[in-house]
Amino acid sequence: MTEMTPTPTLDELPRRFSDFDTLGDALDYAAQGKRGFNFHDARGTLARAYPFRELREDALAAARRLIVAGIKPGDRVALIADTEPQFCALFFGAVYAGALPVPLPLPTSFGGRESYIDQIGVQLDSCDPAILLFPDEIAELAGAAGQSRAIAAYGWDDFGGQDAPDTPLPTANSGDIAYLQYSSGSTRFPHGVAVSHRALLHNLGSHAHGMLINDTDRCISWLPFYHDMGLVGCFLSMVANQVSTDFLKTADFARRPLSWLDLITRNPGTSCSFSPTFGYEICARRIGSQSNVQERFDLSRWRLAGNGADMIRPDVMQRFTDAFAPAGFDAKAFLPSYGLAEATLAVTLMPSGEGMEVELVEETELSGEKRSDGSRPKRFRAIVNCGKPVRDTLLEIRAENGAVLAEKTVGKVWMKGPAVMEGYYGDQEATDACLVDGWLDTGDMGYLSNGYLYIVGRAKDMIIINGKNHWPQDIEWAVEQLPGFKAGDIAAFAITTPGGEETPAVLVQCRTSDEIERLRLWNEIREKVRAITGMNCVIELVPPRTLPRTSSGKLSRAKARNLYLSGDIQPYAVAA
């Protein structure tokens, strides 16, 4: 059996940094070269090399099938986004047909059949697609979701077997909407972010320049295509900037996370690979105290280790560095960033090669509380530098009344630039609430220092007790300092007591069935949180795998709060 050859890193085709009018133009150009995508199985073995030339051929055929099926320019094409060549071809097929591809999440292990159908259903209601296309492996679930909304639904194989006769393709303009992107938290009231070709390609060029992409770079990714970092950063960007990419399915990464590092090791050139903090944490935990790190891995050519999509945890990144430094990993490769789907993707990037920088900020500066008189010890929090704005992007930190705040003052992060979304699809009210005079309210809290952005947390997650601001991450971090607890095991949020007072509640996933041990843990958690944060919190121990997550794997504090208050999360009884 002949060994499959991956698409090359080097190519004679001159690189263009996303300077195209439309996404279709970008693929037309990339297809003239030899680079492309490479899909790997759970063990990291190459299963399919997919040059951009083949992707374009398949996408044009998919476009013709869509047009024959009655799809018109502006129609929405819902795509369940698995990491497969078929998804890539269908996404670009929709683009060539003038339709709007709408990536939707795969089922996860959280929740059951009805939960998934409900989640997909509300997103289908929101985007009102003309067709739903899905991997054949989930035909029962996806078909039921389509049937519940009377939407024509086809498996990829079934649709791919239909005729694709020659038919004229529409001409796109740079101001047209290219696709809709649902943010990872948009389940109950989803907002489809409408991104134009112009905004997309400007952002793709901006972050390619910011990362100093060069001829020896190759991307390695396990990120899902239904999340903005995976879709925009590791799929569309690689086409528009002509970068060969090695893909590992998200589910395969979850089962065998070190396969990600195996792929980076095997890349003879320089690697650019991105992950939220939890990806680095899983790898550091999995390698544990193994002594063969340097024998299995060579991470010395990992040029950019991007981090974003969630709060960046410096303690986790340090553990990853300690675990993999023997394999040649250089902490200067870390590339902290900040972005959101409403800004296409990238808003800020740390300059390449500067690594991760952290500021220790006193609690009163984050909470807005008056400085202490020295009667209690100061408490500090490590805040990660998320870099400088990408080109043509402006940032302001604003108070609640809209006033622009000085440097090193925490407030709401607002941004303006050519990559800001057109709006939320079909929801003018929500659009008007966050887009004001061309400025986007990101919903995040942070501050500026010497032109660099520091993110403190989500405004909606803030816990306000007696007029003082508290960040749930600080409370959760306190619990994580105890043995046996990790990020994702804890959710902190505000509740109202029977007496009408606001107080923090802390849900902690507990793996022991011994009631005496639970009581010991309950007391230990309560005392640890009090010692670190100074707060008395309602501590609730809950069963494992209870805390809800978004489709991209992030903890959903808002959903956890709703489930707790509705009684759907039942804590263990602890005899305090």
Enumerate the language-model features and the residues they cover.
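Structural core segment of the AMP-binding/adenylate-forming
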Residues: 96-163, 170, 276-277, 282, ...
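Conserved pre-ATP/AMP-binding loop-to-beta segment of ANL
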Residues: 35, 153, 163-182, 188-189, ...
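Conserved C-terminal "lid"/linker of ANL adenylate-forming enzymes
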Residues: 489, 493-494, 505-506, 526-576
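Conserved AMP-binding/adenylate-forming
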Residues: 303-305, 312-452, 460-462
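Conserved AMP-binding/adenylation subdomain of ANL enzymes
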Residues: 201-218, 228-271, 286-292
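N-lobe entry segment of adenylate-forming
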Residues: 1-50, 54-69, 73, 97, ...
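AMP-binding/adenylate-forming catalytic core of the ANL superfamily
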Residues: 265, 273, 284, 417, ...
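Conserved AMP-binding/adenylate-forming core of the ANL superfamily
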Residues: 37-89, 109-116, 171, 192-201
